[in-house]
Structure formats: C-alpha cells, structure tokens
C-alpha cells in the first residue's frame, strides 16, 4: 500500500522502546485499590464531591447575577445550571466561544457577564466538544487568551489542510505517536490521527498537548479550586458487530468526564474510571496484573466525539484512492495494518465486557464510538438531564 514519501519511520527501534518514547501510547500502571467499574445508580462519589464543593460557589455567582439584573429576585433556592454546546465543527466552536466570552466575568462587561461563574455543569459534543476540550484542557483560560495565544495562529495554519500538514514536523511526530500506540498493543484507527491533528490546534504544549489526558484535568488549578463547571463530552455507540455503520436514534450515549466514562442508558448502565480506559477488564476486574493509563488522551477523546468517518459506511479504500487530508491520515494508519471499515471508528477496549449490568455490550470485547450528534440529538442535553445532575440547562 503506497505511503507518502515524507513519512519518518523508526523501523529499527523495538516496539517496546517506541511505545516508551511517545507520550501518546498507553502505559502500564499499578491498578487502583478502588473498583474500576460500578453500576450507574447515580453519579460517582468523586463527581458528587466536586459538585458539593462547586455548588456554593456557583450559587453565589448565579445569585449575584440575578440580583444585579433584578434586585427583587429571590435567590433562596437556585437551580443547578448547565451550559451545553452542540456539534457543528469549527462554526460551533467559534459561536460557543462567543457565548462563553459573553458569560465570563473575567472576559466581558456585557449584561450576561458573570453567568458562566454560576454554572454547575458544562457539556459538549463534536465541535462543542472541541471547544470544551480546548477550554478545560488548557486549564480554563479566558476565550480572549485562547484566541490570541493559540487559535488565531493554529486555525490559520490548520494541519487539516494537506499542504500545511506535509510542510511541518507535526506529520512525522503524529506518525511516531500512532506507531507507538500500535507498538503498545493498541491498533490505531484514523480517529487517532484525526484527534492528534485537532489537538495541535486546540491544546497547548509539546506535540499538540500530547501529555494532556482527560483525567489529568482533575489536577488543574481551576478544577481543584472548584472555579469551573463540571465538564462532560459525549459520543455515541455503534453496534458494528450487527453489520450497521451508523447509530440508530435510540443508541447508547456515552459520557466522558475527568473522573468516569460510561452511560446511564439501559443496556450499559455502568461507568469506569477514565484514567484507566484501555485496561483489559472482565466483569469489572482487570485480566492482567497491571492496568493501562494514557488511553484517555484528550485529543483522542475530542476526536472520538467528532468522528464522522463512519458515514463512509464502506470497506476502507486504498490510500491512493482517497482525496485530500484523508489520504494523509490513512497513510499514517496504514503503516501499522491494512485498513478496514473498522478504521472509521474510535475504538476502546470494552470496560463493560462480561459485566452483569451491561447486557447490551457485555459480549463485545471492544466499543466502537462515533460523533455525539449522529443520532439526531445534536445538543448534549442528556448529561444535564440525567439524575441527579442539573435541574436546569440552557445553550
């Protein structure tokens, strides 16, 4: 299968060394003492603790804004409020960013300024997930700061433009990342490359913020200080084993948060710890002596939430037959294996394999996930309405 000539490969390096050299590849780690899987009887203890600490901060800010608007407004029993940002690619990111800027007291003098500080939850999918990932993954700077220090340059020189990708060193680095993930025992798909390309535009740091995992947000100062709403990104399940390519309207909605991944939907009804995504589990217990970390790379997750490659719904064509940026992406993955239709999906070792409560997916060793808006619910309101989350939401 033909490869682009600019690829830089490390064929002479052992697979274990390749994995160790990359910040993208999953890494073995000691398993936690707490259970890795729980049934979805409510939100996790960690999320509950965060919300308990966030609630008085959010209520004070919301009450201050309401009395600023109307001094007679009663603030005795305020609801928890959630902000959601829909899919829509870059347009959604930019319009959603404008909304946040107008609501953020650090960044605006508009009449709506201060409402962001009153939020308890924030959710996004697809383009909205890009926004939330960029905001949370960079420790919640102002939108103005992201615009001037990252987005303006990154969007102008987008790596999703083939000429830009081939001209810079990012192409070789992303290639190395994907090869390292494969060397660690996790075959990559085109979503890995896609997520890495997006991360270069949305996350600060070396190699497109490769060291930023979703779970690492729990250590960021604005999160530990409970200064920000609790973030959730959504994605959809596709039962590829049944021969379908796209999710039905009633498909399972998966939630990614800094603490957990899973779903309240019947058929899954379970959650696992985000930090240990990638760990081989059977009925909730590890099948090996170690667990895996780094699988929750934030670039991969924001790529998962915006994965529409499954809409091709066909056996993956040869690299030479694919136009534009998809040819570049395909060529990188083709270094590791012959492409199939499964490369159109974001794949995750199924943490609910043989788990009693997850009847829909308990027989599947792998989950195949796609864009969170493909089931015609383009706004991620589900996390905000799942008990006992927010009692009100707006977008």
Regions found by a protein language model. Give the residues of each.
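Catalytic nucleophile serine of serine hydrolases
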Residues: 126
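Patatin-like phospholipase A catalytic core
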Residues: 82, 86, 90-96, 105-107, ...
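Signal-peptide-cleavage-adjacent N-terminal segments of secreted and extracellular proteins
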Residues: 16-89, 107
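A short alpha/beta connector and helix-capping loop motif
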Residues: 379-395
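Fungal secretory targeting signals
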Residues: 1-20
